[in-house]
C-alpha cells in the first residue's frame, strides 16, 4: 500500500516534469528516507493516481501512524511539504528554465511556466484554493470581486498549542525573506522546501519574484526586496513599479501604503503584489480630466471609484515617476480641515498613497490612491477605514487588493451566512438569533425590507449580492474624498495645490 503511494508520487513528478526518468530511482529512495522506510515493494502493473492531495494524505497518514510526524494540521503540512521538496528542482535549475523561456519565448511564457510550476510543486495548493468562495457583485463603481478565503489553513487546537511551545527563532526574519527558499519550517513558521523564487533587478537593486501560496486572483505574485528592509513609499517606489511592468507588461503591480491601518499586514519587509488580472478599479473610467502644470504631456484625471484615485498615463515612464513623486510629496504635507484631512497630529504623519502600475495600450500607467490613517474616539480603527456598522462583514485593513476592488473576507462568513440564510427564510425574529448572528441582525432586517420576495430558492444569491454592496460601502468609507459635492470639491482643491 505505502509502496504504491510512493510510486504514485514519483509518477506525479514524472508527469508534471518536476523530475526526469533518470531521476526515478534516486527520487524514490529520497522519499523512502523522508518516510523513514527501508523497504520498497514495486507495485504490480501500471500505477495510476487520481490527484495529488490523496497521494499526500496516504503518505502523511502512514507517517503519522508510525510517529514519523505529529498528527496535527501544522505538522502534517510541514511533512507533506518535505515530501514535495524531494521532487522540487534546485533553484539554479528553476531560474535557468525561467530565463530561457523569458529570452526565447517572452515574459508571458516565462510566467505561465513558473505559475504552473509553483502549483505542480504544491507550493500553491490547488485543492485548497478551490475551496474559496468567489462571486462578482454589480455596483455603481463596476463589478466588484468578492471572495471568502478558505484556503489559508486555520490551525487546529493541537497545532496552536504546539506553536506556543515551539522555540522562538529569528530565521528567516519574516515569511517574505529570500531565506525561506528551501526552509524546512517549524510549528510557528511554514515549510518552504517546495518554494522557489526568481531574482529580478528593478531600479538597479536586487528583488525577487514569487507567487502567493493563497492566490486571491489569477497569477497573484509577490515582488520583494532581497534585503529585509521596511516598507517605504518614496520616489524610488514608482521607479521600481514601472521597471517591473516594463519587464512583465502583462502584469500589474502595486504597493501597499507604508503606514499602519491603511497599509498591509506586513510593513517590516518592502514588497509589492501583482498578477495577471484586471480589477474593477483598472476598468473604471476617468470622471474628471486634469492637467498638472509642467506635465501637459501626461494624461491625468480623477478615476470614477469610491476611493480617491488619480490616474496618470504616459509613454515616458520617467515623467510618471517625476509627477507621482510631486503628488506624493504634496499629499504628505497636505491638510484640509473641511474634509477632515490632516497631514499629521501630535507629530504622527497620516497621509500616504497606495500606488498601482500597469501597461495600457503600450503606455505606462500609474494609479495613485490617496490614503489617510487618522483615528478619532468615534472611529478608533480609522476615520477612512470601514466604519463600525460594517465590521460584521469586514473590519480588517483595506490594503492594496481591496483598494483595487477585490474583497478578501474572513472564513467565518461561510458558516455565518449559511446560518443567516436559515433565519432569514424562516423569518426568525432578530431577538431569537443565535449569539454569533447578533452582529448581523440590523443588516438582516434591512435585507428583508429590501427583499420581501426572499425565499429558500433565492436567499443565497441575495446574500451574496448584499455582501458585495457592503464591500462597496467599505470602499466608500476608506475613500478620503467622498463622492458628493463637498468631496469632489475637496479633491480638486488638492489637485490644484500640486505645483
Region spans (language model):
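Active-site microenvironments that recognize anionic phosphate/pyrophosphate groups
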Residues: 1-223, 227-230, 306, 320-324, ...
Amino acid at each position: 500500500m505505502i509502496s504504491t503511494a510512493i510510486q504514485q508520487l514519483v509518477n506525479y513528478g514524472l508527469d508534471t516534469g518536476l523530475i526526469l526518468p533518470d531521476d526515478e530511482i534516486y527520487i524514490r529512495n529520497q522519499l523512502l528516507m523522508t518516510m523513514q522506510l527501508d523497504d520498497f515493494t514495486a507495485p504490480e502493473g501500471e500505477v495510476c493516481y487520481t490527484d495529488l492531495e490523496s497521494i499526500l494524505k496516504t503518505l502523511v497518514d502512514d507517517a503519522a501512524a508510525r510517529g514519523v510526524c505529529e498528527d496535527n494540521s501544522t505538522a502534517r503540512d510541514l511533512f507533506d511539504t518535505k515530501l514535495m521538496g524531494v521532487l522540487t528542482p534546485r533553484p539554479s535549475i528553476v531560474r535557468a528554465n525561467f530565463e530561457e523561456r523569458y529570452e526565447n519565448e517572452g515574459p508571458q511564457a516565462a510566467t505561465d511556466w513558473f505559475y504552473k510550476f509553483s502549483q505542480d510543486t504544491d507550493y500553491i495548493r490547488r485543492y485548497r484554493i478551490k475551496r474559496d468562495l468567489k462571486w462578482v457583485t454589480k455596483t455603481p463603481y463596476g463589478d466588484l470581486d468578492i471572495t471568502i478565503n478558505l484556503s489559508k489553513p486555520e490551525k487546529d487546537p493541537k497545532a496552536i498549542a504546539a506553536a506556543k511551545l515551539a522555540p522562538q527563532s529569528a530565521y528567516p526574519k519574516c515569511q517574505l525573506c529570500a531565506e525561506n527558499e528551501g526552509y524546512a519550517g517549524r510549528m510557528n513558521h511554514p515549510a518552504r522546501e517546495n518554494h522557489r523564487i526568481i531574482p529580478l533587478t528593478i531600479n538597479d537593486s536586487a528583488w525577487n519574484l514569487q507567487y502567493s501560496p493563497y492566490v486571491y486572483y489569477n497569477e497573484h505574485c509577490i515582488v520583494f526586496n532581497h534585503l529585509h528592509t521596511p516598507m517605504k513609499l518614496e520616489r524610488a517606489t514608482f521607479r521600481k513599479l514601472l521597471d517591473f511592468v516594463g519587464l512583465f507588461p502583462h502584469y500589474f503591480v502595486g504597493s501597499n501604503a507604508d503606514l499602519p491601518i491603511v497599509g498591509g499586514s506586513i510593513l517590516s519587509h518592502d514588497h509589492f503584489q501583482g498578477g495577471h488580472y484586471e480589477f474593477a478599479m483598472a476598468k473604471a473610467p476617468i470622471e474628471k480630466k486634469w492637467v498638472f502644470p509642467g506635465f501637459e504631456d501626461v494624461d491625468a484625471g480623477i478615476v470614477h471609484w469610491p476611493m480617491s484615485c488619480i490616474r496618470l498615463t504616459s509613454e515616458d515612464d520617467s515623467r510618471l515617476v517625476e509627477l507621482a513623486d510631486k503628488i506624493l510629496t504634496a499629499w504628505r504635507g497636505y491638510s484640509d480641515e473641511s474634509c477632515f484631512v490632516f497631514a499629521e497630529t501630535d507629530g504622527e504623519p497620516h497621509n500616504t498613497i497606495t500606488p498601482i502600475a500597469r501597461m495600457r495600450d503600450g503606455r505606462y500607467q500609474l494609479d495613485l490612491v490617496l490614503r489617510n490613517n487618522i483615528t478619532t474616539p468615534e472611529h478608533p480603527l480609522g476615520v477612512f477605514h470601514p466604519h463600525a456598522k460594517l465590521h460584521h462583514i469586514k473590519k480588517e485593513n483595506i490594503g492594496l487588493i481591496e483598494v483595487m476592488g477585490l474583497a478578501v473576507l474572513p472564513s467565518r462568513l461561510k458558516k455565518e451566512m449559511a446560518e443567516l440564510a436559515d433565519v432569514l427564510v424562516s423569518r426568525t425574529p432578530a431577538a431569537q438569533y443565535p449569539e454569533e448572528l447578533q452582529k448581523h441582525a440590523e443588516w438582516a432586517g434591512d435585507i428583508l425590507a429590501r427583499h420581501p420576495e426572499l425565499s429558500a430558492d433565492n436567499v443565497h444569491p441575495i446574500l451574496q449580492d448584499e455582501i458585495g454592496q457592503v464591500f462597496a460601502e467599505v470602499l466608500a468609507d476608506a475613500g478620503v474624498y467622498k463622492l458628493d459635492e463637498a468631496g469632489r470639491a475637496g479633491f480638486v482643491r488638492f489637485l490644484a495645490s500640486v505645483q
